Amino acid sequence: MPRRKRSPEENERRAKIRELLLSSNISSMEDIQDLFKETIAEFMESGLEAELDDELGYGRYDYRNKDTDNSRNGHSSKTLRTSYGDVEVAVPRDRKGEFEPQLLKKNQTSVSQDIEEKILSMYAKGMTTGDIETHIQDIYGIEVSDTTISRITDKILPIAKEWQQRPLEAVYAVVFLDAIHYHVRSEGQIVKKAVYIALGINLDGKKDVLGMWVGENESAKYWTTVLNGLKNRGVEDIFIACTDNLTGFSAAIGAVFPKTEIQNCIIHQLRNSSKYVSYKDIKELMADLRSVYAAVDEPAALDALDAFSTKWETKYPKISRSWRENWANLSTYFKYPQEVRRLIYTTNSIEGFNRQLRKVTKTRSVFPTDDSLFKMLYLAMVDITKKWTGRQRDWSMIHAQLSIYFADRMPE
């Protein structure tokens, strides 16, 4: 293959490099690495000095153009990790401590740190490693491999596992429990795994993800393990637990938190009820069920359920039977005022969170390991929960109502 013809600019650059190598007495690869380190230090220091000039509005010793009561205040030394080894950089300071350099941020310890943060951010938004490679190449002109991306994202695992084990509050007003399912490669096979999620609302009305656990397909036994884990991390009481109607779930909650009231999700019950209803009946049947769950109180709801049974028993006997069998945990919300009812009668809070997780993970049909699934969910969770800054709607009223219903369990 013929050698590519260089441009005049490239030839000029090469001549300067040759001149630099000769004047620097380069005799080994180690000498070249030292030269690279000096070049990085010079580039950083020149850029930082220019940034401070811009911040203060005047150059060094240019006192005639000084129009500020702030001034330079020497330098601090910072060790920067690079692929060629550690580099000492003299970072200029200002007297007021207001200078926030952008080229080398205050907490930055590596020249690759900014790119690593970008990779983690893209991974958290569900981009594939291939997409991330292309994006980094387009923006920075840097090639990163699948292995490099995995190595960078793996750095988050110890942080994620520490988060999973952090201490929790002693009392939660409401905890929503649900699971979402993914395919993971295990011992040469693709298996279905459940991600168990607990989302809590504390007594200040703040929402928080208490944990996410990758386990075998959803079971009451595993939920018992999850609930015991919450207890071991400091949770002493949960006023109300909102769940789907998984067999054995109520017993699992009762075994760990015996005082907790259980509210089965009405939306899950409606989905199960409508599963085998013919298209021509669905609208009318769902309207009749609405008379049950939207009733003003429990006696009115039971009357509506009786009316539903009379009308639909012959055609769909399993529906009214299911509502009656699960009534104890479906009807919990009727004892509370409307504000509390709205909060607990569905698992919308956790389902909304799950929807956002699925949006991030939809590009992955199969995860190579449990850890790869967990780190993506953790990064996505951090990204999603950044917006969870406020309290739940009507929280002052809800708290006052819970203080009446759970007077003996409400902390002072």
Where are these regions (language model features)?
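Conserved beta-strand -> loop -> alpha-helix junction used to position metal-binding or nucleic-acid-contacting
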Residues: 240-247, 252-288
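RNase H-like nuclease fold core
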Residues: 86, 90-95, 103-107, 142, ...
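DNA-recognition alpha helix
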Residues: 130-141
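Short, amphipathic alpha-helical "recognition" segments used to contact nucleic acids or chromatin
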Residues: 113-126
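Acidic/histidine-rich catalytic cores and adjacent linkers
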Residues: 3, 258, 291-412
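Short, conserved DNA-binding cores of transcription-related domains
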Residues: 1-106
